[in-house]
């Protein structure tokens, strides 16, 4: 096991900066997930750690060793890719044993390691099969098993579930999380899927345009996003954003959301007269027919554009009289349809405020 640190790490391809001044400490035994849209720098960061790309500036350490100049084979890591890269002419056993054979390990030690990993992953009965005889989920387990037998200090996983269907992905998420718990080894995982990130990571590093936006626990990312990007990226459906304006009413500073007057929070008042964006998560917008007991309600009149029945909830797409569109997640018992005029209710205790120009959160 080992900790990992990125210290002012930059990776530049000609004029394109893929990773920009990344500073990140990953604890020994932690499950850290890099998440972000395509091209954000998450996979490049993993490849820099693996030694598949060279660092332009800064340094990467595994434990107390600087690894910038070390080849991948000398970094004591194991990597699982999106494409499982199994040798088609080899059996499962031979695929899992291959790296140990190259290292010249004794046959009995290889057998013990392979059988132990196979038992851990529930693939003991597949050891004699070839990859073409396996399902996608089974191939994924073999690829993970091949990494386990090496007993690395750090596991690196680059979108390993992308090739699985939805049901298998749920199962594989649970298996990888359990594997991390059983092995107590550092896992660094890359995905564009926020569900994978939220359900698997001890902490999540959110990236955009090569820059680390926020690294925190799943709960803190969701409840205390550092900026507009994180707020909009984490959560499905995404957070709604409204432009709010300042006004004076009866000698007091207020805010206006499409004509609906709101009190001015102290934190916002301290921010001066800078332009504001208000964030409201879809689950904090309610139909008046079904309201939770403890909220500070505010009416938000709107016209319904579309309703999606999800079974346990309704996803409602609506639009205010001023033309601002938003999404609400409401009780499925509500009888609501397209073109209905509804006075939705929002919980003002669950508002998020952002500096519109700086895009940073105001707490």
Curated annotation (Swiss-Prot):
Regions annotated as coiled coil: none
Binding site for ATP: 36-43
Membrane topology of this protein: Peripheral membrane protein
Effects seen without this gene: Insertion mutant loses its GG uptake ability, and shows leakage of glucosylglycerol from the cells into the medium. Mutation does not affect salt tolerance.
GO BP annotation list: carbohydrate transport
Subcellular location: Cell membrane
EC number, as in UniProt: 7.5.2.-
CDD domains cross-referenced by the UniProt entry: ABC_MalK_N
Residue intervals of the ABC transporter domain: 4-234
Induction or repression: Transcription increases in cells adapted to higher salt concentrations, whereas transcription is weak in basal medium.
GO MF annotation terms: ABC-type transporter activity; ATP binding; ATP hydrolysis activity
Gene3D superfamilies listed in its UniProt record: 2.40.50.100, Nucleic acid-binding proteins (2.40.50.140), P-loop containing nucleotide triphosphate hydrolases (3.40.50.300)
Protein family membership: Belongs to the ABC transporter superfamily.
Annotated function: Part of the ABC transporter complex GgtABCD involved in the uptake of the osmoprotective compounds glucosylglycerol (GG), sucrose and trehalose. Responsible for energy coupling to the transport system.
PANTHER family: MALTODEXTRIN IMPORT ATP-BINDING PROTEIN MSMX, OSMOPROTECTIVE COMPOUNDS UPTAKE ATP-BINDING PROTEIN GGTA
Assembly description: The complex is composed of two ATP-binding proteins (GgtA), two transmembrane proteins (GgtC and GgtD) and a solute-binding protein (GgtB).
Protein name, entry field: Osmoprotective compounds uptake ATP-binding protein GgtA
Organism: Synechocystis sp. (strain ATCC 27184 / PCC 6803 / Kazusa)
């Amino acid at each position: 096991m080992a900790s990992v640190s990125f210290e002012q790490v930059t990776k530049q391809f000609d004029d394109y900066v893929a990773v920009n001044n990344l500073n990140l400490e990953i604890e020994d035994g932690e499950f850290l997930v890099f998440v972000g849209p395509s091209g954000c720098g998450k996979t490049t960061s993993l490849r820099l750690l693996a030694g598949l790309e060279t660092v332009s500036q800064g340094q990467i350490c595994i434990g107390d060793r600087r690894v910038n100049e070390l080849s991948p084979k000398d970094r004591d890591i194991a990597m699982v890719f999106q494409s499982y890269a199994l040798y088609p002419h080899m059996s499962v056993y031979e695929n899992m044993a291959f790296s140990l054979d190259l290292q010249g390990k004794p046959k009995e030690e290889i057998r013990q390691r392979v059988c132990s990993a196979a038992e851990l992953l529930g693939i003991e009965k597949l050891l004699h099969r070839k990859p073409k005889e396996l399902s996608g989920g089974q191939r994924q387990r073999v690829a993970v098993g091949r990494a386990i037998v090496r007993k690395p200090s750090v596991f690196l996983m680059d979108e390993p579930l992308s090739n699985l269907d939805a049901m298998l992905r749920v199962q594989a998420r649970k298996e990888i999380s359990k594997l991390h718990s059983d092995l107590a080894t550092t896992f660094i995982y890359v995905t564009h899927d926020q569900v994978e990130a939220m359900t698997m990571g001890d902490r999540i590093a959110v990236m955009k345009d090569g820059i680390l936006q926020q690294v925190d626990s799943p709960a803190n990312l969701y409840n205390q996003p550092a900026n507009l990007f994180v707020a909009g990226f984490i959560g499905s459906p995404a957070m709604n954003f409204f432009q709010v304006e300042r006004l004076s009413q009866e000698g007091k500073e207020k805010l206006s959301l499409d004509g609906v007057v709101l009190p001015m929070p102290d934190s916002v008042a301290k921010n001066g007269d800078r332009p504001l964006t208000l964030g409201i998560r879809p689950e904090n917008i309610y139909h008046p027919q079904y309201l939770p007991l403890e909220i500070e309600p505010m009416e938000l009149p709107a016209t319904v554009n579309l309703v999606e029945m999800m079974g346990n909830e309704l996803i409602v797409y609506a639009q205010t009289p001023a033309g601002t569109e938003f999404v609400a997640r409401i009780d499925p018992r509500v009888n609501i349809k397209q073109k209905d005029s509804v006075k939705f209710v929002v919980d003002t205790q669950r508002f998020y405020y952002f500096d519109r120009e700086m895009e940073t959160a105001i707490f």
